[in-house]
Amino acid sequence: MASYLAEEYKETVAPALKEKFNYTSSMQIPKIDKIVLNMGVGDAVSNAKNLDEAVEELTLISGQKPLITKAKKSIANFRLREGMSIGAKVTLRGDRMYDFLYKLINVSLPRVRDFRGVSTRSFDGRGNYTLGIKEQLIFPEIDFDKVNRTRGLDIVIVTTADTDEEARELLSQFGMPFAR
């Protein structure tokens, strides 16, 4: 069974975008390509257990096993050696991507304290949107009692849109709560 947002895209979002931007081909209509979740764990240098906890939390949030990222260069001031594990990332595609986006928009973002909408200035100029989450506790899968420290994560929504305006409209159609 296809995801709710995947069905929503086919039935309402794609036709609305085609009409608004006057696309001639259905292949011109922007769509979400992938969602990348990245959790940098800088304190993993001193305590490797912190990285294991971050990987476990990212697995719960995304529903798939994260890739552990390694340092590209050694930085003496940070006591960092090349090749040390310093974070984790997950790339979501297909139904998992749509399920995560639905959960993010309808469950997690409304749980953010003093939430007034996400910034409209976080587009990169090529139709991709980046969102920073300050604490992982907004996700319903994370048990508040089992968390020993709050960690943030970056969420990058990669679209096939050519411009920021097209990407903003695409995400708005999906229900992304942009700040006025």
From Swiss-Prot:
GO terms for cellular component: ribonucleoprotein complex; ribosome. Keywords: Ribonucleoprotein, Ribosomal protein, RNA-binding, rRNA-binding, tRNA-binding. One of its GO terms (molecular function) is tRNA binding. GO terms for biological process: translation. InterPro entries: Ribosomal_uL5, Ribosomal_uL5_bac-type, Ribosomal_uL5_C, Ribosomal_uL5_CS, Ribosomal_uL5_dom_sf, Ribosomal_uL5_N. SUPFAM superfamilies: RL5-like. The keyword Ribosomal protein applies. Pfam families: Ribosomal_L5, Ribosomal_L5_C. Belongs to the universal ribosomal protein uL5 family. HAMAP family: Ribosomal_uL5_B. NCBIfam families: PRK00010.1. Part of the 50S ribosomal subunit; part of the 5S rRNA/L5/L18/L25 subcomplex. Contacts the 5S rRNA and the P site tRNA. Forms a bridge to the 30S subunit in the 70S ribosome. This is one of the proteins that bind and probably mediate the attachment of the 5S RNA into the large ribosomal subunit, where it forms part of the central protuberance. In the 70S ribosome it contacts protein S13 of the 30S subunit (bridge B1b), connecting the 2 subunits; this bridge is implicated in subunit movement. Contacts the P site tRNA; the 5S rRNA and some of its associated proteins might help stabilize positioning of ribosome-bound tRNAs. This is Large ribosomal subunit protein uL5. It comes from Lactobacillus acidophilus (strain ATCC 700396 / NCK56 / N2 / NCFM). The gene is rplE.
